Swiss-Prot record:
Residues that, per the record, bind substrate: 66-67, 88, 193
Site (Transition state stabilizer): 31, 253
Enzyme Commission code(s) on record: 2.7.2.8
A Pfam family it matches: AA_kinase
Function: Catalyzes the ATP-dependent phosphorylation of N-acetyl-L-glutamate.
Name this polypeptide is given: Acetylglutamate kinase
The keyword Kinase is assigned to this record: yes
Keyword hit for ATP-binding: yes
Matches recorded under HAMAP family: ArgB
Gene name of this polypeptide: argB
């Protein structure tokens, strides 16, 4: 490394210091998903980011998805994926595979990546320590032909109804980094598959996290000129949904951000997980995505 490169690195570290102080002993929940999960280089960079957060005195918690991997496993096992209103129908056989893929293979891959940095990650799902309880999701759609609201039966797709933070509080006092799969039990004894975004929002809300980061395949919320909006209040975000600036798949993402803020999260960020070290760029600089605040 040349002296000029060393000087640049030193300046970057000095610039990061105020942000390290700002977030010291604070909880940051990161929802890991999208393209980054299928790219080994991005996966390694993500693990390094999480490790550095922990080494900087921050309490990081990872929640991950795995829709494409679930679809691939179902296909491999000859089980056809069924969708209602764009949502996967999870029958009894499918939920077993969902749990196997999410809480098994994907979860342990992420744990292994973080552990390779020298940090200690622990793989969990909502069942562990009675951390999360869910109930059957209640979803409706408007029938385009009759314009009548129709109730969807999505099987074992759930919604979070309760989060017990006891286990996560214990882990926060330890050297462990929780990596959580969005699978949880119901009071009825069933196992439920939960949308990873809403699961992460529920976890972050229960912990009153300082930040919730959503790693996506887009830079953040864009204005009508396709320029990144750096910060929005909840009321501004709602206005952009109403006027059509926020549209399509970004609407449920932003609504999940709003729900998380209502639950107690101080700020939620939508950022591009395809950018290497995007988590560090968001936390230790002036920001890399769209920050939504109360």
């Amino acid at each position: 490394m040349t002296s000029s490169e060393s000087e640049i690195q030193a300046r970057l570290l000095a610039q990061a210091l105020p942000f390290m102080q700002k977030y010291e002993n604070k909880t940051i929940v990161v929802k890991y998903g999208g393209h980054a999960m299928g790219d080994s280089t991005l996966g390694k960079a993500f693990a390094e980011d999480i490790a550095l957060l922990k080494q900087s005195g921050i309490n990081p918690i990872v929640v991950h998805g795995g829709g494409p991997q679930i679809g691939a496993m179902l296909s491999k096992m000859g089980i056809e994926s069924k969708f209602e209103g764009g949502l996967r129908v999870t029958d009894a056989k499918t939920v077993e595979i969902v749990e196997m893929v999410l809480a098994g293979s994907i979860n342990k891959e992420i744990v292994a990546l973080i552990n390779q940095t020298g940090e200690w990650a622990i793989g969990l799902c909502g069942k562990d320590g009675n951390m999360v309880f869910a109930e059957k999701a209640k979803k409706t759609v408007i029938d385009p032909d009759s314009n009548i609201e129709r109730v969807l039966d999505l099987g074992f797709v759930g919604e979070v109804v309760e989060v017990d933070r006891t286990l996560l509080d214990l882990l926060a006092k330890s050297e462990m980094i929780p990596v959580i799969a969005p699978v949880a039990p119901g009071r009825d004894g069933a196992t439920y598959n939960i949308n990873a975004d809403t699961f992460a929002g529920a976890i972050a809300g229960a912990l009153h996290a300082t930040r919730l980061l959503f790693l996506t395949d887009v830079p953040g919320v864009l204005d009508k000129n396709k320029e990144l909006i750096k910060e929005l209040t909840v009321s501004e975000a709602r206005a952009l949904i109403k006027d059509g600036t926020i549209s399509g798949g970004m609407i449920p993402k932003v609504e999940t951000c709003i729900d998380a803020i209502k639950a107690g999260v101080q700020g939620v960020v939508i950022l591009n997980g395809k950018t290497p070290h995007s988590v560090l760029l968001e936390i230790f600089t002036e920001g890399a995505g769209t920050l939504i605040v109360p």
